[in-house]
Amino acid sequence: MYTTYQNLYKQLTNIYPLNEAKAIVRMVLEDRFGLTLADIYTDKVTQLSADDASKLEKIMLRLAKGEPVQYVLGSVTFCGRQFGVAPGVLIPRPETELLCEWVVNVLDKPYCALQPPTPLRVLDVGAGSGCIAITLSLDMPNTVVSACDISPEALLIARDNAIRLGAAVNFQLKDALQLAATEETFDIIVSNPPYICDSERTEMMQNVLDHEPPTALFVPDDDPLRFYRAIAEYGTTALSHGGELYFEINDRFADEISAMLNALGYAGTEVRTDQFGKQRFVKTMRA
């Protein structure tokens, strides 16, 4: 197969905007075939071995069908680390990195190693690939982190990621809508639950609809806050007094979510925007 960088990205322009198509091809050539940016722009792709050229052709066929490049490569970069992903688990987004950064910046305080404080107990509801739980475990060493998800497939991937990255996270199979009260309490509960309304499907890219798990993305139009309500209600007993709850949210419902949290007795509710200026995150505290 003789091809050029230009020929490769043109195969994807019916699915992606031009710049995104170029970025996807660069990602493949760098990650899978070890080409540098200079190699790509000087069309060293034309010098691939017959075996590598065959592998590239198969990759391009998958990409041309709309399969996300993260699934094709089997990994995604999140907070500077490589997380394994596969069909059946949501691909982590850059916005969620900002959620992790907020938690870490607020709660990771210096301490004397000879007299460490009691570890913070953290729960991630809706673990997916484990990106939030693993990041918090690694970036906030004085923590005991648990995470739950309803998907056995996602938990297998999350556990593999934790082992490979050296994170101690207790993963459990649980339904976020049916979290039962226990004697265990947490200092932090964090969640990026499904929050896209069914009616918003028409605004989504087709390859997301075709390939990513809908149960990790969508909520019914008549109850868009169902996950926030369930987790917040659980937090009224599962959070320690003064413990904090962090959500990634649909920007359409920032006011409604804040009002719901206040009605449940939470205090100090704060909303933050993402890199696009959308109201994307909420932090609140159990009084």
Placement of each model-derived feature along the sequence:
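N-terminal auxiliary segments of SAM/dcSAM-dependent transferases
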Residues: 1-73
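S-adenosylmethionine
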Residues: 139-144, 148-286
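Short, low-complexity, intrinsically disordered N-terminal peptides in bacterial proteins
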Residues: 1-10, 109-118, 287
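SAM-dependent Rossmann-like transferase core, predominantly class I methyltransferases
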Residues: 44, 54-141, 145-157, 283
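Alpha-helical elements of Rossmann-like donor-binding domains used by nucleotide-donor carbohydrate transfer enzymes
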Residues: 7, 27, 55-58, 98, ...
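Residue-level signal for pocket-adjacent positions within structured domains
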Residues: 35, 43, 67-68, 73, ...
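Short, solvent-exposed loop/helix junctions and linker helices
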Residues: 2, 15, 49-53, 90-93, ...
